[in-house]
Amino acid sequence: MKKPFYITTPIYYPSGKLHIGSAYTTIACDVLARYKRLMGHEVFYLTGLDEHGQKIQTKAKEAGITPQTYVDNMAKDVKALWQLLDISYDKFIRTTDDYHEEVVAAVFEKLLAQDDIYLGEYSGWYSVSDEEFFTESQLKEVFRDEDGQVIGGIAPSGHEVEWVSEESYFLRLSKYADRLVAFFKERPDFIQPDGRMNEMVKNFIEPGLEDLAVSRTTFTWGVPVPSDPKHVVYVWIDALLNYATALGYGQANHANFDKFWNGTVFHMVGKDILRFHSIYWPILLMMLDLPMPDRLIAHGWFVMKDGKMSKSKGNVVYPEMLVERFGLDPLRYYLMRSLPVGSDGTFTPEDYVGRINYELANDLGNLLNRTVAMINKYFDGTVPAYVDNGTAFDADLSQVIDAQLADYHKHMEAVDYPRALEAVWTIIARTNKYIDETAPWVLAKEDGDKAQLASVMAHLAASLRVVAHVIQPFMMETSAAIMAQLGLAPVSDLSTLALADFPANTKVVAKGTPIFPRLDMEAEIDYIKAQMGDSSAISQEKEWVPEEVALKSEKDVITFETFDAVEIRVAEVKEVSKVEGSEKLLRFRVDAGDGQDRQILSGIAKCYPNEQELVGKKLQIVANLKPRKMMKKYISQGMILSAEHGDQLTVLTVDSSVPNGSIIG
């Protein structure tokens, strides 16, 4: 019997309308839930809303309604969106649910009694929008008065911070730091994709894991601490516990918790909240003596050509506008096909419409149309019996499908959807090629080979049946439409799937309907841009014709050949320390793909007072500079590249998934 499978999205913070970023996470979890069900697992899929906090209280006040009314309205809208996206969740939790609040209060008192929570005072820079405290060194930008004193700043998210000093209860994270590191070593695959775990250890644990403020007294919209009700439980204990309370943890009926928490547990989150799920959540589970989840998947973001989505930029994409215009399946397909594992993906209207036309309409839609039409034309709509090796091309088609099915399952288990879909489209491409190879229109002539023609039709129908099965977790409507045109019932099982299993004496529809009509590229691209509020960018505007401009450079112009002599590589920071006797220099040990680490000295110490935040980062370095001796005793082999504007300096980094030693250029 297969283990029960538990999959969760993060619970979303309902302070505004959800865009395709939240839709991505929810669809990604839905795809996995549907796949696991088709593979024979009992699945519990959880999503929901994180409804407490200062920002909600403020938003409600601005709207002239109570916080409860505000979150009730938001919950209604979010549920409607998930219905539109056909999300097959088993439970929608809200942190304002009575059962959840009762368990949160009880857990807080339990941890207080066992001295894992203690009362203290917190002072620090706080972002209301992020519901998070920051140290000065973590701020993206620092504001100072005329005396040089810090008076404010900007969080990494871009939101402004304010100084907060108040009595607070603290969670003893520091007590569990060694145990957490040991857990990471035992379970190196716990955080995916690879590289994310090292970021957490280097950036947050090795510099010294600080205890976490877990209560607030400056607002009231939250779960009151029973023994000290002027405090409300701060967001992360409240929010993270949803994964357990939704299953019945701490309640009279805990059958689902006993079943699914002891099965396979997967959490999927955006990379921006990985720290809370990879550090706070495991430690909270340790405090409660509960088993650890099996996998924590931190995906990248969908961004636009001009950066993150922003209403002010006119580049926000909401799922409703795409579903209403193009249908649900193209959106689900595009989101799952276009975001590389471990990296960010770029949304463009051109790419969206292009994938519909070329991959869905041309590749898949035309294959179905041609197959159904030929079976009707040559065999009166009845699919001939499947036989092996009826033509010289059957064996290769079968081998390709078997190999791609194995790849598909491997990538689905790894939650690598782009590669899983690539395997499916390899089957589709090979089947389209099979039509050209076998030339059924020639076999159908009077002097043709009817037995070979029958084998071709059977193989085409069988291949499409395979495709309909493997796309079902992604595109339910398309899968059902293909099966219906082939005369088959909807897909209900994926655990056993073979090309030769096409049912005998099956009759296809008399006339197939295109499942993806071709789109007018220009018109549909303009539609998306207009919906995004980017009316200035539609294609009717005068095309930009670039002209040669006068170069504004602080240095002499160089030739391409001169630049080509410079080798820029990706290098991971293994260690960094201040250089004794110098206020400017930092000493780096980096892995630049040389087979052994190299040392680089860089004069950026004043810009990085907390130099340990650079450990684990992947930087860009000039790798082929002639080594030079510095401070009489250090050899520096390379240069760390940075961007400088005014008195601000930032080292240039790359995504953590890029291998060390990769050439940039």
Swiss-Prot record:
Keywords, sorted A to Z: Aminoacyl-tRNA synthetase, ATP-binding, Cytoplasm, Ligase, Nucleotide-binding, Protein biosynthesis, RNA-binding, tRNA-binding
Enzyme Commission (EC) number: 6.1.1.10
Enzyme category, top tier: ligase
Catalytic activity as recorded in UniProt: tRNA(Met) + L-methionine + ATP = L-methionyl-tRNA(Met) + AMP + diphosphate
Pfam family, one: tRNA-synt_1g
Main subcellular localisation: cytoplasm
Keyword RNA-binding attributed: yes
GO cellular component: cytoplasm
Record localization: Cytoplasm
Motif ('KMSKS' region): 308-312
Binding site for ATP: 311
Molecular-function annotations in GO: ATP binding; methionine-tRNA ligase activity; tRNA binding
Record motif 'HIGH' region, residues: 12-22
SUPFAM superfamilies: Anticodon-binding domain of a subclass of class I aminoacyl-tRNA synthetases, Nucleic acid-binding proteins, Nucleotidylyl transferase
Function: Is required not only for elongation of protein synthesis but also for the initiation of all mRNA translation through initiator tRNA(fMet) aminoacylation.
Family per record: Belongs to the class-I aminoacyl-tRNA synthetase family. MetG type 2B subfamily.
Protein name as annotated: Methionine--tRNA ligase
Organism classification: Bacteria, Bacillati, Bacillota, Bacilli, Lactobacillales
Gene: metG
